[in-house]
């Protein structure tokens, strides 16, 4: 593969059995996509990962751009329709279809990537950028990223499943207004399950479940590990049953979150 540009969004602890058990080791594996004489955009770094990327880029003479340093996104906010509004250096206000908090860092990365592609000859107009941000789901088929399922009670799903993704989800949940939080949670067996569960809000009512894939951890085991993290709830053998229970228990002013695994979200979306 000979790309015109490479992008590495961020580094988090995931797939550690394949990528390594430190951020530096994972970054080294991810840096393998950096190609000779090809610009690369790095979305987010840590003190551990930044020198890894810089060294690899220097070895293959790849121009490297750190999106956090270019900082083409000035700030973001949510409008009344739940769309995220980005104040940007190059395009003033951009309306984004994806409302998830993690999209702020992603957008900053995208803006750096767009500028590079334009500089190497891609005919990307402002109208293209606005259309892409405003209609990313319909244009790409993307689903399950802080996706609103229903109102009263408000139900949202998100496929974030590692500590990096869950950190954004927990922060965004803390920004919501609700009477009671209900969380439908299932996980697969190759993640940092205890680490993720320890991050979740203890005041929520939990519905532990199992996605319809072989890698899914049993609902009983999720419940056991969650109990060690101070989380309480009942178990349900399928995502559909867990969601029905949450809906039955929730009042109109409550909030239902469905996540923990891409496969849990997939089971939800396939049942709609």
PLM-predicted stretches and their roles:
Residues 1-7, 11-15, 25, 90-205:
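Nucleotide phosphate-binding/pyrophosphate-handling subdomain across enzymes
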Residues 11-20, 133, 144, 210-225, ...:
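Flexible, gly/pro- and Lys/Arg-enriched active-site loops
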Residues 117-121, 173, 226, 250, ...:
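Active-site catalytic pocket residues across diverse enzymes, especially alpha/beta-hydrolases
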Residues 46-65, 154-157, 163, 194-255:
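C-terminal helical cap/extension that packs against the catalytic core
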Residues 17-18, 51-53, 76, 166-167, ...:
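Short glycine-/acidic-enriched loop or helix-start segments at secondary-structure transitions
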Residues 3, 7-87, 107, 111-127:
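Acidic, Mg2+-coordinating active-site environments of NTP-dependent enzymes
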Residues 261:
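Active-site-proximal loop/hinge segments that shape catalytic or ion-binding/gating pockets
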């Amino acid at each position: 593969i000979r790309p015109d540009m490479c992008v590495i969004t961020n580094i988090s602890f995931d797939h550690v059995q394949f990528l390594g058990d430190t951020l530096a080791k994972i970054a080294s594996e991810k840096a393998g996509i950096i190609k000779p004489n090809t610009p690369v955009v790095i979305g987010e770094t840590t003190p551990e990962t930044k020198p890894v990327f810089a060294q690899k880029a220097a070895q293959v003479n790849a121009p490297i751009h750190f999106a956090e340093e270019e900082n083409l996104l000035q700030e973001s906010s949510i409008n009344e329709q739940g769309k995220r509004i980005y104040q940007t250096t190059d395009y003033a206000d951009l309306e984004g279809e994806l409302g998830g908090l993690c999209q702020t860092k992603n957008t900053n990365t995208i803006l750096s990537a767009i500028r590079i592609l334009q500089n190497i000859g891609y005919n990307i107009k402002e109208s293209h950028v606005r259309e892409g941000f405003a209609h990313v789901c319909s244009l790409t088929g993307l689903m399950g990223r802080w996706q609103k399922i229903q109102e009263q009670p408000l139900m949202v799903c998100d496929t974030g499943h590692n500590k990096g993704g869950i950190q954004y989800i927990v922060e965004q949940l803390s920004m919501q207004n609700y009477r009671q939080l209900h969380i439908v949670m299932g996980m697969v067996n190759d993640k940092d399950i205890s680490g993720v569960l320890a991050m979740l809000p203890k005041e929520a009512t939990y519905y532990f479940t199992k996605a319809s894939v072989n890698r899914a951890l049993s609902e009983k085991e999720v419940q056991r590990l969650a109990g060690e993290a101070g989380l309480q709830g009942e178990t349900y053998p399928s995502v559909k049953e867990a969601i029905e229970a949450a809906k039955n228990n929730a009042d109109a002013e409550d909030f239902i979150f469905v996540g923990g695994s891409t496969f849990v979200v997939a089971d939800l979306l396939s049942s709609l």
